């Protein structure tokens, strides 16, 4: 479990137009379990949230107010990671989920796992692999380096198709983010974390800490922040 004293700050880009917007956002987020402080910045179009609530719950709470949100950074510098989980087999949506990791204390990291588009309803099991080599998909990621014993329950119907499910989970592990970077992250139906049961796989990469990412236009594509968000949503990256 995470102690309230092990809170972290995360920043989110959120469209806001006036003081009424900031008030509604603050009220919605303060109702989320684990949220301790909410600080909207109308001029910068950013909302800072401190607490122990997973980023996915913040994004969901903002969506309930009719607003989109983009996680811009979380935790201290060099204390966050992300993995896009792609299908480990042919067929179905190519992207099956997202993992956000935030270190909240020395050798203690929160894993916010969101799955969407996997066969189900079903129970799925997550593990961090020894290797980040995905040249042969899950088969080349090597043995399990760390396993999460509890299942990710995918019990909601996915909007991506019939007989597909969605679900999320919040896990805590005695790990430092520095040790995670470049490792594979696998989700599968096998409780023993065997490669044969792999459903989705990705590679953990470093992500920005709070206030480290103020980009509004992509230097590569020229797309704005919200154009990139639209492309990500189309690809099932929530």
From Swiss-Prot:
Q: Which domain of life is it from?
A: Eukaryota
Which family does the UniProt entry place this protein in?
A: Belongs to the CCS1 family.
SUPFAM superfamilies in the record: Cu,Zn superoxide dismutase-like (SSF49329), HMA, heavy metal-associated domain (SSF55008)
Keyword terms, alphabetized: Chaperone, Copper, Cytoplasm, Disulfide bond, Metal-binding
Q: Name one GO cellular component term.
A: cytoplasm
Q: Summarize where Cu cation 2 binds, as residue positions.
A: 218, 220
Record's cofactor remark: Binds 2 copper ions per subunit.
Q: InterPro entries, from UniProt? A: HMA_dom, HMA_dom_sf, SOD-like_Cu/Zn_dom_sf
Binding of Cu cation 1 occurs at 18, 21
Domain HMA as annotated: residue spans: 7-70
State the Gene Ontology BP annotations: copper ion transport; removal of superoxide radicals
Where does this one sit in the cell? Cytoplasm
Q: Name one GO molecular function term.
A: superoxide dismutase copper chaperone activity
Principal location:
cytoplasm
- What is the name listed in the Swiss-Prot or TrEMBL entry for this protein? Superoxide dismutase 1 copper chaperone
Give cofactor(s), names only. Answer: Cu(2+)
Q: What does this protein do?
A: Copper chaperone for superoxide dismutase 1 (SOD1). Binds copper ions and delivers them specifically to SOD1.
- In its UniProt entry, the species of origin is given as Eremothecium gossypii (strain ATCC 10895 / CBS 109.51 / FGSC 9923 / NRRL Y-1056) (Yeast)
């Amino acid at each position: 479990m995470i102690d309230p004293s092990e809170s972290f700050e995360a920043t989110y880009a959120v469209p806001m137009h006036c003081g009424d917007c900031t008030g509604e956002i603050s009220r919605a987020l303060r109702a989320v379990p684990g949220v301790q402080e909410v600080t909207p910045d109308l001029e910068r179009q950013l909302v800072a949230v401190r607490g122990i609530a997973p980023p996915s719950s913040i994004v969901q709470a903002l969506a309930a107010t009719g607003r989109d949100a983009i996680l811009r950074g979380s935790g201290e510098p060099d204390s966050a990671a992300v993995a896009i989980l792609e299908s480990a087999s042919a067929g179905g949506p190519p992207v099956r989920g997202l993992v956000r990791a935030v270190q909240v204390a020395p050798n203690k990291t929160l894993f916010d796992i969101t799955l969407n588009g996997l066969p189900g309803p079903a129970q799925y099991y997550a593990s961090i692999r020894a290797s980040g080599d995905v040249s042969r998909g899950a088969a080349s990621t090597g043995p399990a380096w760390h396993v999460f014993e509890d299942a990710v329950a995918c019990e909601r119907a996915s909007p991506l198709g019939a007989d597909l499910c969605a679900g999320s989970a919040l896990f805590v592990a005695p790990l430092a983010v520095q040790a995670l970077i470049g490792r594979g992250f696998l989700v599968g139906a096998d409780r023993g974390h065997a490669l044969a049961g792999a459903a989705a796989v990705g590679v953990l990469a470093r992500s920005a800490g709070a206030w480290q990412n103020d980009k509004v236009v992509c230097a590569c594509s020229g797309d704005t922040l919200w154009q990139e968000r639209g492309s990500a949503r189309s690809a099932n990256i929530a």
